[in-house]
Amino acid sequence: MERKIEEFYHKWKNDIIRKPLVLYGAKQIGKTFSVLEFGKKEYKNTVYFNTDNNKELLGVFKKERSTEKIILNLSLLSGETILKDDSLIILDNVIENDIIKGLKIFGSEHSKYHFIAITSKKEK
């Protein structure tokens, strides 16, 4: 049985004007599981970051404002090659506004990189 959220993910992935997706919801309801499953099915590779106390990751989004430098740093941190249009980058447990702000440049400049940020905290 396919979940309604999977249909939403497919529409998001195929949208011409795709922006980073911020998935907000209560804790422990399956957000991360559903995104990881979607990544396994739909992408060549899935790059997962748990942002809890990840100072290196936070530093990337605080310091860099170039999409290419952010992608390069994420590749180095994960040890994975991030492919345009064929990698899903998951940022889990996002509570830092700097990460959300950093993702906004991918909405305005590059829709070739597929980001999903998962949080249980509403952005202020």
Region roles according to the model:
Residues 1-124:
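Phosphate-binding site recognition
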